Regions:
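Residue-level detector of alpha-helix initiation sites
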Residues: 25, 174-175
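Intrinsically disordered, low-complexity segments enriched in glycine/proline and serine/threonine
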Residues: 59, 64, 141-143, 268, ...
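Conserved acidic functional residues
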Residues: 117, 172-173, 332
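Conserved active-site-proximal phosphate/metal-binding subdomains
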Residues: 148-169, 175-322
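Glycine-biased, low-complexity coil/linker segments
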Residues: 323, 331-333
């Protein structure tokens, strides 16, 4: 039986599993595949490539349910992109890394739910004041951009702050049903998953990048600024990017000031490497959950695996599941 939570009820989905809006990686194929499997796919709006956004949203018009996610500080530079997104009639718009207030009225007026990703209580209060319908509490284990607090710290803190006013979704270091079950025990209504879906058939990433995720372990990631500054992307504090370690990261870690001074030169090298698929220079944005990823299956299979394993844990079924929950807690499978 699917796990019912306030999140599944609010979004009308079978499983409390959302796929992260990973810039260009989370295209319409991945978004649709996750939603068709009973989760909630979120298209990546990224840094605001208008042409790509128009193409990807055109593929999703008339489809439901799905969401579209934006980097808030980048969207502020091209606010007209929100109109393109809303024209596709998504069920939700997800905003991360910035003040959602300037965009919240238009989102709510469209009928879409406002999802806000936060990394602190202050950000959560700001999101609630803006009318967020769902909060995503992101831990530092997450791939791509994030802050410094761990998932097991930030999730219950945001759950307590929300005080059941809105569902809270956990993000960061989650790749299987054990992660979903654990986050629900912390009070989350579901999970947002990125890296595990990056290593899926439908993700837009290069096959070499997916293979690097599959072969990596959790010690092979690092959080820092090298990948961003190599692209002349200077994110606001406190946000940094978690990537797989490669030759380029090793070369410039500890030399960030020099990197900033040589950003134009390094940027040419980085862009050429990305175009050539050279991932010893170009970054693979991935989280600490890489150590739990050992294959590259269809997204639907990932959703079903996670949902089934979590259900087994939360209902106390022991077949093929390790580390089951103590008996006083099983069978309460909601959040």
């Amino acid at each position: 039986m699917p796990i019912a939570t306030p999140l599944t009820e609010l979004l009308g989905i079978r499983h409390p599993i959302l796929s992260a809006p990973m810039d260009t990686i989370a295209g319409s194929r991945l978004t649709r595949a996750v939603s068709e499997a009973g989760g909630f796919g979120i298209l990546g709006g990224g840094y605001g490539d208008r042409g790509r956004l128009e193409t990807e949203t055109a593929e999703l018009k008339g489809f439901a349910p799905f969401g579209i996610g934006f980097i808030t500080w980048s969207l502020a530079k091209q606010p007209e992109l929100l109109d393109i997104a809303l024209d596709a009639r998504p069920q939700a718009i997800m905003l991360s890394f910035g003040d959602p207030a300037p965009f919240a009225p238009r989102i709510r007026a469209s009928g879409a739910r406002l999802i806000c990703q936060v990394q602190s209580e202050e950000m959560a209060r700001q999101a609630l004041d803006a009318g967020a319908a769902i909060l995503i509490a992101q831990g530092t284990e997450a791939g791509g951009h994030g802050a410094s607090r761990t998932t097991v710290d930030i999730v219950p803190a945001i759950v307590d702050l929300a005080a059941e006013r809105v569902p809270v979704v956990a993000a960061g270091g989650i790749a299987d049903g054990r992660g979903l079950a654990a986050m629900m025990m912390l009070g989350a209504s579901g999970v947002l998953i990125g890296t595990r879906f990056y290593a899926s058939v439908e993700a837009n990433g290069a096959q070499e990048a997916k293979e690097r995720i599959r072969m990596a372990n959790s010690n092979d990631t690092v959080r820092g600024v090298v990948a961003d500054w190599s692209r002349s992307l200077f994110w606001p504090a406190p946000f940094t990017a978690r990537t797989l370690v490669n030759d380029h990261i090793r070369r410039w870690t500890g030399r960030e000031i020099e990197l900033m001074q040589r950003a134009a030169e390094v940027g040419v090298e980085y862009a050429a490497a990305k175009a050539a698929g050279n991932f010893e220079v170009a970054a693979v944005f991935a989280g600490e959950a890489v150590g739990l990823i050992h294959d590259i299956p269809p997204a639907a299979e990932i959703v079903e695996r996670i949902a089934t394993e979590a259900e087994q844990l939360l209902t106390g079924r022991r077949n093929s599941v390790r580390g089951v929950l103590p008996s006083p807690l099983v069978g309460e499978g909601g959040a």
